[in-house]
Amino acid sequence: MSKDEYLITDKPLKALTIFAMPMILGSFFQQVYNMADSIIVGQFVGSSALAAVGACAALTNVFICVALGAGVGAGVLVSRYFGARNYSKMKTIVSTSLISFCVLSILLGAFGFGFSRLMMSLLQTPADILDEAVLYLQVYFVGFPFLFMYNILSTMFTSIGESKIPLGLLIFSSVLNIFMDLWMVADLGLGVFGAALATLIAQGVSAVFSFLIFLYRMRRYKCRYRWFDRQELQLMLRIAIPSVLQQSTVSIGMMIVQAVVNPFGTQALAGYAATMRVENVFSLMFVSIGNAVSPYVSQNLGANKTSRIKKGYCAALLLDICFAAFAFIVIETLHTQISSLFLGKDGTALAYQVSGDYMRWLGYFFIFMGIKMATDGVLRGLGIMRPFLIANMVNLAIRLSVALIFAPRFGIAFVWLAVPAGWLANFLISYAALRKSWPNDETERAVS
């Protein structure tokens, strides 16, 4: 057995831990991009500039989730063929997806750049931060193809059991981003534009190096393959489209929630934006475990080692419980200090109250998010996308309905009160579907 095949040979808990830890660290450093922007802008420019950057977060997440969802479709098939040692089909999927998604990313970037002001206006962005928010967003969309390509390549690496290379690249680009943020924002005084430009350059460097390293990595599997295969593209889209719909629709929902928050004013938005950054950091621990479970399940399914799938699921749940406890302790003891990193000295009492209340509420219920993500990861790995999509839509419906109906009448707290209820409902639906779909040793749910 090759050392690349440890996901189908090592003990499930050991394999998932080894595989997931670089992904968790990588996800953390990916969030450092946005955190560096927010902290440095908040400290050196002010809370209004922080609100401008934060106002873009919900919209940029929609486009990021399109990239992540597209990567899921390719990643599940790459893992399946890798586990089955069908390297010809694996390389065909890799080439087909890179060509297709490169074109898509350019089109999406051009669309986002051209309609930045319209989209921010539709979100009811406060007038005093609208121009800065649009500027940040337009610079972001110039670099969107780099971000899209990096996310696709990162999924490819993890699909073949390699999670350390994306980690190394992210550490490098994150450090580069922080230094350029400090130079452009603090020294040159470029404000929001400097923060966006620093992120663009760092993401571009990461994408280029990822592409070159991945090309070199693929030389290990010497076989004939097709540069573009329409049939394989259709198979990939069968998995990718539900995932894109799920991820982008949830982000659109969060964008609608952002529109609910905006009328509460710039300071409330600053507090909300600060905690959204913190939520992204902690939630990525659970997202990474879910993302690690998918290739684990898919590789073992491709290798016809279906008895290992349920053991891997239990191992993922154990990891989620540990991380939920860690998140609770950190938030409960340090929530004020964490808020001050983003809000700085000119953050008002309202901004600190919104940030602290939202953050502590999340800390109590992160366990629901963890078990939801692990269950969703198994469904993706098995290619069972319909219940996965339905469960996430129910999650979104709960969050949106409470925010839209109750927040304008009874206060901003209702924006986050329904979050854990949505996570729990999502888990229950996904788990019910999973119990009916466990493969056995005689059944293989391969996509063919």
Question: Can you say where each PLM-predicted feature lies in the sequence?
Answer:
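Short alpha-helical transmembrane segments in multi-pass integral membrane proteins
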Residues: M1-A20, V78-G143, D187-I241, V297-Y364, ...
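Hydrophobic transmembrane alpha-helices of multi-pass small-molecule transporters
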Residues: V62-C65, N177-D181, S206-F211, V281-L284, ...
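Small-residue-rich hydrophobic transmembrane alpha-helices
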Residues: L50-A110, L147-P166, G271-H335, M369-G383, ...
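Short runs within selected transmembrane alpha-helices of multi-pass transporters and secretion channels
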Residues: G71, Y140-T158, P166-S174, A195-V208, ...
